[in-house]
Amino acid sequence: MSLDTLITHNTLLPATPDAQPDACALVLMGGGARTAYQVGVLKAIAAMIVAQLPGKPSPASPPPAFPFQWLFGTSAGALNACYLASQAVHGLDALPRLATFWSALRSERVYRLEAPGWVRANRIVAGLTLARQVRRHRALLDTLPLVDTLHRAIDLDALERALAQRIIHVLGVTASSYTTGEHWTFCQTRPSHPVQPWHRPGRRAEFQPITIEHLMASSAIPFLFPAVPLWVDGHKEHFGDSGE
C-alpha cells in the first residue's frame, strides 16, 4: 500500500467541503520490531505537541485533539492504526495509550505453540508435533491469544464514534488475498463519505466496517499464522499479511 495509491483514488480527499484542508494522514508499515519503533515515535510526537502548547496544561484540562484524520496500516501496522482509531475519542492521549498497550504485550498474548519443552530434545518428535500443530491450526502457531488480546484492547464502537464525530475520516487496513493474489485495502468511513470502491491491476479497495478478522487477516504471517477468510465480492477468500 502506498500513499500515492490512496491519493490517486481520492481516499484522502475531505469528505465534505467544510472538512479540514490541513488534515493529516498516518500510514503505518508492518513488521513486529518496526511497529514497536512506530509506537516510540508516536509517543514522542505526542510529547512534542504538548510541549508546543501555550502555557502549561493542567491535569484537569482536556487533552489536545487527536492529530491524525486518516489512518492506514498493514500487518502489525494495521493493529496500531486500528487501536489509535478506537482511542481517537480520547484525543492526544491515544498515542501514549498505544505505548502502554505495547509495554504490556507478551508473546503468550499473541500466539501459542502447543509443544512441551522436552519435545525440542528430539528432532523427529519435534517434527511430528509441529506437523500436528499445522494440521490443527493450519499454521505453525495458534493465534487465538491474539484474537482475545485485540478484542479486549480495541473498542470498535469507539471507532465508530470517532468517525461519526469526525475526529477521524478513514481507517484503512490492507491484506493480500491468497485466493486471487490481489492486494486489498479495506476502509471504514462514516456513511456519508462519498468515496467509492476502486479496482486497478493487482489492487482492490472495499469500504466496509473494520473488524478484528480484518486485523488478523492483515497480520497473518504466511506459514506461521493461519490465513483468515473474509467476504469479498459475495464470496469468501483467504487473506494474509500483504508484505507491503
Predicted regions located by residue number:
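Acidic-glycine-rich active-site phosphate/pyrophosphate-binding loop
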Residues: P14-D18, P54-S58, A220-I221, V228
